[in-house]
A protein has these predicted regions:
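A conserved regulatory-domain signal marking ACT and ACT-like small-molecule sensing domains
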Residues: 1-116
Length: 116
């Protein structure tokens, strides 16, 4: 089953590498990973999407909580949350392709930006 784990960690060099190393050493798979500064500039929020049964996820959470840079770990799959994904695609610019892209823009969640 797919699970989302939120990790608040100190904004220090090597913190991401320690988290990735934990997953690698225990053969856990990271399906998706996102890291950004939190509201406290000394900390970062890491969001990890992984899969496994409840016992595996419980083990991952316990192991993450033991890491030196980790402040807080929470499994948020069953909590209320908003999910979004982003994709960057580079395409050749032409009038025909621009018209095709405009026709794809079917709702406010799809935003197309033209690089200058």
């Amino acid at each position: 089953m797919r699970h989302i784990i939120s990790v608040l960690l100190e904004n220090e060099s090597g913190a991401l590498s320690r988290v990735a190393g934990l997953f690698s050493a225990r053969s856990f798979n990271i399906e998706s990973l996102s890291v950004a500064p939190s509201e406290d500039l000394t900390a970062s929020r890491m969001t990890i999407v992984t899969s496994g049964n409840d016992a595996v996820i419980e083990q991952i959470v316990k192991q993450l909580d033991k890491l030196v840079d980790v402040i807080e770990v929470s499994e948020i799959t069953s909590s209320d949350h908003i999910e979004r994904e982003i994709v960057f695609v580079k395409i050749k610019d032409s009038d025909t392709e621009n018209e095709n892209l405009k026709s794809l823009k079917t709702n406010e969640f799809l935003k197309i930006h033209k690089a200058e």
